[in-house]
Amino acid sequence: VLLNKKESIMTLQKSLEKEFVTKGYTIDNPKIIKDPYKASPLTALILFKTKTKVSPKVTIKGKDINTTFTHNFKNSKEHYLEIYGLYPDKENEIEIEYKENDQVVKKAIKIKTDKLPSDLHLPTKIFADKTKLSNELYFFTPAVKGYSVAYDVNGDVRWYLTNKAVWDNTRLKNGHLLVGTERLIYKPYYVTGLYEIDMFGKVYKEYSLPGGYHHDYFEMPNGNLLVASNDFHNSSGTVEDIVVEVDRNTGKIIKTFDLKNVLNMKDGVSENSTSYDWFHNNSVWYDRDTNSITLSGRHMDAVINIDYKTSKLNWIIGDSTNWSKEYQKYFFKSIGENFEWQWRQHAAMITPKKDVFIFDNGNNKSKIKEKYVPAEKSYSRGVLYKINKEDMTIRQVWQYGKERSSSFYSSYISDVDYLDKNHYIVHSGGIVKGDLKSSNYPAGLTKGKVSLMSDTVEILNNEVIFEIVLPTNNYRVEKMPLYTDTNLSLNNFKKLGTLGKTKVNKEKIGILNSNKNLDNIIKKYDIKLLNEEDRLVFSGRFKKNNKVNVILYKNFV
């Protein structure tokens, strides 16, 4: 059958939740559902009832105190205990404890899990000073292919999603995660929007955007979402130069920031600049105190800050070479020793002290081709800048990575996180080598025998207290606790926003002749039709620039 229909998220989740019953189950005979939403294999749901209201405490036993998790559940007679952080391919030990009628009740439960997928990557190196670490996990998202995975301080996998979830993976104020959908809207990597999920992988909301989602988002103080998006129908044919504010409750776009109205598209040209991807925004950060938005333009080697209310440009961090005269006043003048500009940066953020924290990928280290530094002599850094907007000066106050030379060099992606004063994560997520030599390009563009790596370092008071090396590229990493105060809700899934409408050519085509070789054509071009809840997806393999017409009848179902 050419046409396949995809089951809706609501239908699938409602079907699974029919099994979530507590009636007839007690602490001595609880119901245990492994991976209840078929999306997060290292989780389980334990269900039972008690005669009186009790507050169960659950302990998932680890190898040591840094890998053992405890969570207290709310007072109730009906119990839906979320079990997270199970080890793969192991009989896990879980202890449930509560007090009822002045009696302490304890119950030990064992849950056996399956093996990890063969293509899920395990660490090749782990260093952990456990005296300075908690039991929080390190949540990684894939560069392109792969899994969203959380590792503990021993490097063991304690959580992962089977559904593809790309780009950022940050916890919202309500305790849920916000991840990119698996649904492609436009090549090469733009997806339809965002899913709000819990640790089971249950989807509570889907936010769809006409311009899709890429790279980053930010949860504003009022709960709305600032999302890196596109306008696929703009007259300039550009991408990655739009940021939208999405109403959290309705999914409607209530404000649009178009960077074509802020910057000159021909300024600040770097090696990676193209006419359509001139800015390449890869991070979004909102600062309440200044009511401003900080964005990272990789292809301009520039971090910019704009006014939220007016969209006017406030300042630019970066080398001002190749920028027109009218923009020079927005650049900072460097002061102090050992200062270096950032190049092809990612993950720009504003710290509580109003410093600017950036992952400096370090590509070329110049805008002038004759001065380009080759990959084998390049290095990437997490760098902290202190800016003075009164006299427009900038000082480099901290960095990590230069001392690691090209072994820590990521030509693309990567991340930094501010955890607390003098406490940071620097994630070099795009280390690529071709024939053992550092590459300036992602894996698909690197020649020779390609090897991939990500190297993530946690630093406290200038001392490395944790490091994890993985044999793959990872987009970002977030250090987060396994549990929050948010418990499972059986509320229905909400679909918010819109993908817009596809332009239709109303030209009359005429009579369509049946083709006896239709099956061969479908096979030759790998043609597929997928009927989703909000769109019909046509896919196939054709020669570049070939025109393909998709003709639908009015009575098509």
Predicted regions: what is each one?
Residues 4-14, 18-56, 60, 78-80, ...:
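Histidine-/acidic-rich catalytic cores in large beta-rich domains
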Residues 70-76:
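Short beta-strand segments within Ig-like beta-sandwich modules, predominantly Fibronectin type-III
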